[in-house]
Amino acid sequence: KSQIQFHNGVTSKEIQETLIKAAADLISAETPNYQYVGGRLINYALRKEVYGGFEPWHIKKLVEKNTVAGFYDAELITKYTDEEWNKINTFIKHDRDDELTYVAMEQLRGKYLCQNRVSGEIFETPQMCYILIAASLFQDYPIETRLQWVKEYYDAISLHDISLPTPVMAGV
C-alpha cells in the first residue's frame, strides 16, 4: 500500500507529484492498471503546467508563446497560414495521452518534451510534441499535400505505429 503524507502549506503541484508517486508505487503484477493511473496523473500535471488548466490551447497559441520564449524556431509559425493552423489543430487527439503509461509519460516529460533544462519548466504536452514534429517535417512540402502528410505522420507517431529515434524526439 502507498503511504501518502501531506503537511501544512503543501502546494497543489506537490500534491499532484505525491499522487503520481503513490500510483507508481502501486504498480505490480497484481495491479498493473496503476501504470495508467500514474500516466494520467502526469498528464493532468503537464496540462496544468503548460496550459494553466486542463483544457489544451489552440496549437497556434502554443507555438506563438514558445516561439516568443525562444524555445521554438521562429520560422515555423510563418510556414503555415491561420487556416492551416486551424486545420492542424483539428488533427490533434489529446485523449491519446490517456493511453500512455506512467513509464512512457515519465520518459516524455524527462527527456523529450520541450522544456527549460535549468528550471525544469515544460512547455508542451505529448500530443502537441507529436503534431509539431509532423508540422516541422512537412513544412516545406507542397501546399496542396502537406496537411495530409502532417495528419498521417502525426497519427502514425501518436498512435505508436512507428517510433522515432531520440534525436528527432529531443528536437535535435
Task: Name each model feature, range by range.
Residues 1-172:
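Extended catalytic cores of very large enzyme megasubunits
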